[in-house]
C-alpha cells in the first residue's frame, strides 16, 4: 500500500507541478495541498486521470488554525475504488476568500460544503445553495471556530406558556470550574483535604 502511495505522490507531483503547494506521505496516508486558485483543476485531475480515478468523495471538512494568516484548511477525503486508494486534498483560505465549490465535480459535495460553511464560516463560490444546514436559522457565529465561546451566545428552549421556542441569553448555573485531576502514574504531589489515609501513609 505504501509503495502505491509513494508512486501516486510522485505521479501527482510530476503532473500537477506548481498547482500543488505540498505533498505529505505520513502514517500510511497521502495528503496533497493545492493552491487555492487551482483546487478545481486538481480535483478534476484526480477524478478523471486513469492512474488516479478518485471518483468518490467521502467527506469535506474544515480545520481552524487562528494563528495563521490563512486560518482555515478545507480537507477533501477522496476514494478510488478502482485502485483501492484514499487521498486527502487540502486547500488553505481565510474568512473572506471563497473556495471554488466542488459541487460540479462531485455531486455529493453540496451538503458537505454547507456543513463546512455552517460550522466554520468558510465560503464556497459557485455553490447552488450555500446556507446553514445544522444550526438554527437565527444562529450567530460558527461553532467549530476556535474563537467561538464554549457556552455559546444564546440558549433556546420551548416555553410551554408561550407555546413556542424562545431564545434567551446564556445563564450559567455555576462558575466555570477547573478540575485538577491527578495522574495515576505520578501520584499526588500534595495531600487532598479530608484525605487522612494518604496523610497517615506518608
UniProtKB/Swiss-Prot annotation:
InterPro entries according to UniProt: NADH_DH_suC, NADH_quin_OxRdtase_su_C/D-like, NADH_UbQ_OxRdtase_30kDa_su, NADH_UbQ_OxRdtase_CS
Organism encoding this protein: Bartonella henselae (strain ATCC 49882 / DSM 28221 / CCUG 30454 / Houston 1)
Bilayer topology annotation: Peripheral membrane protein
Keyword Translocase in record: yes
Similarity section: Belongs to the complex I 30 kDa subunit family.
HAMAP family: NDH1_NuoC (MF_01357)
EC number of this enzyme: 7.1.1.-
Catalyzed reactions: a quinone + NADH + 5 H(+)(in) = a quinol + NAD(+) + 4 H(+)(out)
Pfam family name, one: Complex1_30kDa
Annotated keywords: Cell inner membrane, Cell membrane, Membrane, NAD, Quinone, Translocase, Transport, Ubiquinone
Compartments where found: Cell inner membrane
Function noted in UniProt: NDH-1 shuttles electrons from NADH, via FMN and iron-sulfur (Fe-S) centers, to quinones in the respiratory chain. The immediate electron acceptor for the enzyme in this species is believed to be ubiquinone. Couples the redox reaction to proton translocation (for every two electrons transferred, four hydrogen ions are translocated across the cytoplasmic membrane), and thus conserves the redox energy in a proton gradient.
Subunit-structure text: NDH-1 is composed of 14 different subunits. Subunits NuoB, C, D, E, F, and G constitute the peripheral sector of the complex.
Name the record gives this protein: NADH-quinone oxidoreductase subunit C
One of the record's GO molecular function terms: NADH:ubiquinone reductase (non-electrogenic) activity
Keyword Signal part of the UniProt annotation: no
A GO-annotated cellular component: plasma membrane
Superkingdom, taxonomy of origin: Bacteria
Amino acid at each position: 500500500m505504501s509503495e502505491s502511495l509513494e508512486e501516486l505522490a510522485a505521479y501527482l507531483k510530476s503532473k500537477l507541478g506548481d498547482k500543488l503547494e505540498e505533498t505529505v506521505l505520513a502514517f500510511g496516508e497521502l495528503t496533497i495541498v493545492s493552491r487555492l486558485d487551482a483546487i478545481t483543476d486538481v480535483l478534476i485531475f484526480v477524478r478523471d486521470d486513469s492512474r488516479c480515478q478518485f471518483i468518490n468523495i467521502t467527506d469535506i471538512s474544515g480545520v481552524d488554525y487562528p494563528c495563521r494568516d490563512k486560518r482555515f484548511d478545507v480537507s477533501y477525503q477522496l476514494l478510488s475504488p478502482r485502485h483501492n486508494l484514499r487521498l486527502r486534498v487540502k486547500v488553505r483560505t481565510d474568512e473572506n476568500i471563497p473556495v471554488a465549490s466542488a459541487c460540479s465535480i462531485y455531486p455529493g459535495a453540496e451538503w458537505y460544503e454547507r456543513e463546512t460553511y455552517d460550522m466554520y464560516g468558510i465560503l464556497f463560490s459557485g455553490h447552488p445553495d450555500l446556507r446553514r444546514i445544522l444550526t438554527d436559522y437565527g444562529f450567530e457565529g460558527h461553532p467549530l471556530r476556535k474563537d467561538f465561546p464554549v457556552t455559546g451566545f444564546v440558549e433556546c428552549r420551548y416555553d410551554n406558556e408561550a407555546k413556542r421556542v424562545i431564545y434567551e441569553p446564556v445563564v450559567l448555573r455555576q462558575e466555570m470550574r477547573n478540575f485538577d485531576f491527578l495522574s495515576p502514574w505520578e501520584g499526588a504531589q500534595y495531600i487532598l483535604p479530608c484525605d487522612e489515609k494518604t496523610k497517615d501513609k506518608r
